[in-house]
């Protein structure tokens, strides 16, 4: 008679006390389990007891090609138990989370990891529940006796109580907030973000180390609260040699894969430097590359390398055109000429005088582009000239009707221009920005009405149908540091803004929407 199998919901202690189940029958197929993601594997490894071998630092550096300096900085800043907060920042897919979790794995003291993947959490309440559940023996939910705090002050109190119980046992707790920039997109995220950055001051627990991982720059989180500033570790983009080392790591046939990367990596690296995107594209290409081979463990000679290259060359061109398709929009000149499509138009766009920068589409809505141009004009032009620049007769085209300026007035204009250059971009209220925005968008609509667009191409290109929620676009531009917002003026009682872009970028944005920006810029 076979022994009973341990039920699924049996606790860990009862399962260890129960007799071991009988071995599975040879005829019964094994149950397939989903393969855990690399990040879950790293989390499990980081939560495991630290290794005691003397080569742990060397093993860590071997697991992180191209990140030796960053790994050493993380170990140096996190190794002592009472450590200041740490922020890892850099572009996407630059190895920030992997370097952190592997470094925590090799830390010597007894430590406990509390990890919050903010990209997978939809709200502050879900974040509170995730952190408190990892620190508590019983999960926090609305149905249990442990209720999730709704207020940030209640959350800080509950978090302090949970951490006190762990710290009192001599453990070091590492609180990791991954993808910190996601908090800004949450409801009331602007209030939660300063709270998370001030947890070191609010908790007052030396054995609790806070680590923030962000794809945004530290300037995006600057606040004047007087809290302790974290230590920063910057992760730059990978070089082509570093990407090659990462892709070659633990490959079963390094010589064959090296010959493949020498053909396919550099063309793809010119388009993207993200390791995850490159890995996703290179995997099917490598299968195509190996199709002429009968044995995948064979080492190709020079003649075989040439034959493999000729076989994969056409597939590599398809991968460049399909996988990394750069979004573009037909210019108004092409609409006037009747439009053009196909490979010929793509070649003309990429072979321009200014290169890619003059033809690539900006990753923002059309209304945001017009709002950015309005802010640039409001910062550059004096407010007293708005009526003359944005009149119904076409702006500065009516200079012929002006009487000749005297020597004194010309000298005064020169003085005003010099003062403007010394002061830099000026500030402006919201009312003036909206007035200029309304004027230049109406000018754009008049230009579109004069062009006979076949097949309604203008509407497809996104030039018409401007978004009505201008305030939301304004907030996005401020968060992206295209605009700066100052405090409310004590006299006017409203906030003032300032444009942070230069004339070259403004002209590129204007060309992308076919707006005559130079016509509305004040020049001496």
Curated annotation (Swiss-Prot):
Residues 1-19, 39-49 have a biased composition (Low complexity). This is Origin of replication complex subunit 1. InterPro entries: AAA_16, ORC5, ORC5_C, ORC5_lid, P-loop_NTPase. ATP binds at residues 90-97. The keyword Nucleotide-binding applies. The gene is ORC5. Component of the origin recognition complex (ORC) that binds origins of replication. DNA-binding is ATP-dependent. The specific DNA sequences that define origins of replication have not been identified yet. ORC is required to assemble the pre-replication complex necessary to initiate DNA replication. Its main location: nucleus. Disulfide bonds: none annotated. Component of the origin recognition complex (ORC) composed of at least ORC1, ORC2, ORC3, ORC4, ORC5 and ORC6. ORC is regulated in a cell-cycle and development dependent manner. It is sequentially assembled at the exit from anaphase of mitosis and disassembled as cells enter S phase. GO terms for cellular component: nuclear origin of replication recognition complex. It comes from the Eukaryota. Residues 20-31 have a biased composition (Pro residues). PANTHER family: ORIGIN RECOGNITION COMPLEX SUBUNIT 5. SUPFAM superfamilies: P-loop containing nucleoside triphosphate hydrolases. Induction: Reduced expression upon sucrose depletion-mediated cell proliferation arrest, and accumulates after sucrose treatment. One of its GO terms (biological process) is DNA replication initiation. Residues 1-56 are annotated as: Disordered. Pfam families: AAA_16 (PF13191), ORC5_C (PF14630), ORC5_lid (PF21639). Belongs to the ORC5 family. Keywords: ATP-binding, DNA replication, Nucleotide-binding, Nucleus. Expressed at low levels in the shoot apical meristem (SAM), leaves, ears and roots. GO terms for molecular function: ATP binding; DNA replication origin binding. It is found in: Nucleus.
């Amino acid at each position: 008679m076979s022994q009973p199998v341990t039920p699924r919901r049996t606790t860990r202690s009862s399962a260890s006390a129960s007799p071991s189940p009988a071995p599975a029958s040879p005829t019964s197929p094994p149950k397939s389990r989903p393969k855990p993601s690399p990040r879950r594997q790293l989390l499990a490894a980081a939560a495991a007891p630290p290794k005691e071998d003397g080569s742990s630092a060397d093993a860590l550096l071997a697991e992180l090609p191209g990140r030796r300096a960053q790994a050493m900085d993380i170990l140096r800043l996190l190794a002592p138990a009472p450590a200041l907060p740490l922020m890892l920042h850099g572009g996407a897919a630059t190895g920030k989370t992997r370097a952190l979790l592997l470094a925590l794995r090799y830390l010597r003291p007894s430590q406990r990891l509390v990890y919050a993947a903010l990209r997978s959490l939809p709200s502050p309440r879900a974040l509170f529940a995730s952190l408190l559940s990892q620190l508590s023996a019983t999960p926090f939910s609305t149905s249990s006796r442990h209720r999730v705090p709704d207020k940030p002050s209640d959350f800080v109190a509950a978090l302090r109580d949970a951490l006190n119980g762990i710290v009192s046992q001599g453990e070091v707790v590492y609180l990791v907030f991954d993808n910190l920039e996601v908090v800004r997109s949450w409801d009331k995220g602007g209030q939660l973000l300063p709270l998370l950055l001030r947890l070191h001051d609010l908790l007052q627990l030396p054995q609790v180390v806070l680590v923030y991982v962000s794809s945004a720059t530290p300037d995006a989180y600057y606040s004047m609260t007087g809290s302790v500033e974290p230590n920063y570790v910057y992760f730059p983009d990978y070089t082509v040699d570093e990407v090659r080392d990462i892709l070659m790591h633990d490959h079963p046939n390094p010589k064959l894969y090296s010959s493949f990367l020498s053909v396919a990596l550099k063309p793809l690296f010119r388009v993207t430097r993200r390791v995850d995107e490159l890995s996703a594209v290179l995997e099917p290409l490598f299968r195509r590359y190996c199709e002429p081979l009968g044995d995948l463990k064979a080492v190709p000679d020079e003649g075989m390398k040439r034959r493999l290259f000729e076989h994969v060359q056409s597939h590599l061109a398809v991968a460049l055109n399909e996988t990394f398709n750069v979004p573009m929009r037909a210019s108004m000149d092409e609409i006037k000429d009747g439009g053009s499509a196909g490979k010929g138009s793509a070649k003309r766009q990429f072979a321009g005088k200014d290169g890619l920068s003059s033809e690539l589409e900006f990753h923002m809505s059309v209304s945001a582009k017009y709002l950015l141009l309005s802010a640039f004009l409001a910062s550059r032009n004096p407010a007293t000239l708005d009526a003359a620049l944005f009149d119904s007769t076409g702006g500065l085209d009516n200079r012929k009707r002006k009487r000749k300026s005297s020597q004194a007035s010309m000298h005064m204009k020169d003085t005003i221009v010099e003062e403007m250059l010394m002061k830099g971009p000026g500030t402006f209220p919201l009312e003036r920005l909206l007035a200029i925005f309304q004027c230049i968008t109406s000018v754009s609509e008049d230009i579109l009405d004069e062009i006979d667009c076949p097949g309604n191409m203008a509407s497809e290109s996104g030039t018409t149908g401007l978004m009505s929620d201008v305030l939301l676009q304004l907030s996005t531009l401020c968060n992206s540091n295209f605009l700066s917002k100052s405090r409310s003026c004590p006299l006017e009682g409203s906030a003032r803004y300032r444009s942070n872009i230069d004339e070259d970028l403004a002209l590129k944005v204007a060309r992308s929407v076919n707006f005559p920006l130079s016509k509305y810029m004040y020049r001496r």
